[in-house]
Structures are given as structure tokens and as C-alpha cells.
């Protein structure tokens, strides 16, 4: 045994899991599920009866919460599925940079400058037009599995 002390650099994040397990049979419509490593919102669930050999199966149809793609998965109802931790936070829009990044005001008064404008055309147009008109805009940012994206907009009146 050595008398040397070992110093370990802590990792940047707290090591919190991006997902948690939930039994497939308990996941409902409008819930969340991870399919093909993507966080999704469940739009349809159907369950098949137990066969001669095996389990009842759950058929999930879900929409990726960030890119809107439809994904499907079939899982035995007694098995666990990964469910993403999904958070939605509102920030006040301060500025839009020329390279497509937004500057947002957080609750504690600091700014968040690492988010790009959304890819959804109608939302993008609403944000740009509202900002150009000098309106006070609040954007909702959805975050899950290490990804973040602006998903909604609220107009709280003129500045």
C-alpha cells in the first residue's frame, strides 16, 4: 500500500441519470418513452394478449420531442422501458444573434446563450417577428437526455 494521496477531478455533471426505468405496461398515452435512444412522447399504446408462449406485448407509437419523427417499439408489458426526465423551463428572450443563437434571461438573473433558434418554421417566424416588433417574449425550453430546444412562445406584451 502506498502513502500517496490520490486526487480525482470531479466530472462536470452530477452523474444524474438521463432516464429512469418504468414497466412497459404502466406507460400511457401522452407519457414519455425512449425509443432508439431518442426521447419521445407517446401518442398511441396498444396491448396484445398473452400468447401460448410469452408475455403480453405493448406496442408504442411515439413522436420524437425534438425532431418530430414518428417512432414505434414493441415491448413485453412486464419489461422495463427507459423513460426520459423531461423538463420545461420558461426564459425571457433578450437577444437573437446573427448566427442563430438566442440570449435568454434565467430566473436568477444570469443569461443563457447556448441555445439555437428552433428549426420549426412557424415558431421561428413568430419569434423573429415578435422580437423585431419589440415585444416582450417568453420562450419555453424543453430539455431531455442532454438536449435542449425552444418548443413554445408566449407574448407578454410590448417592452
From Swiss-Prot:
Modified residues (Hypusine): 52
Matching InterPro entries: IF5A-like, IF5A-like_N, NA-bd_OB-fold, Rib_uL2_dom2, Trans_elong_IF5A_hypusine_site, Transl_elong_IF5A_C, Translation_prot_SH3-like_sf
Keyword match Protein biosynthesis: yes
GO biological process: positive regulation of translational elongation; positive regulation of translational termination
GO MF annotation: an example: ribosome binding
Tree of life domain: Eukaryota
Gene3D superfamilies for this protein: 2.30.30.30, Nucleic acid-binding proteins (2.40.50.140)
Protein name as catalogued: Eukaryotic translation initiation factor 5A-2
Keywords per UniProt: Hypusine, Initiation factor, Protein biosynthesis
Composition-biased stretches (Basic and acidic residues): 1-10
Family indicated by similarity: Belongs to the eIF-5A family.
Region (Disordered): 1-21
Posttranslational mods: Lys-52 undergoes hypusination, a unique post-translational modification that consists in the addition of a butylamino group from spermidine to lysine side chain, leading to the formation of the unusual amino acid hypusine. eIF-5As are the only known proteins to undergo this modification, which is essential for their function.
Described purpose of this protein according to its UniProt entry: Translation factor that promotes translation elongation and termination, particularly upon ribosome stalling at specific amino acid sequence contexts. Binds between the exit (E) and peptidyl (P) site of the ribosome and promotes rescue of stalled ribosome: specifically required for efficient translation of polyproline-containing peptides as well as other motifs that stall the ribosome. Acts as a ribosome quality control (RQC) cofactor by joining the RQC complex to facilitate peptidyl transfer during CAT tailing step.
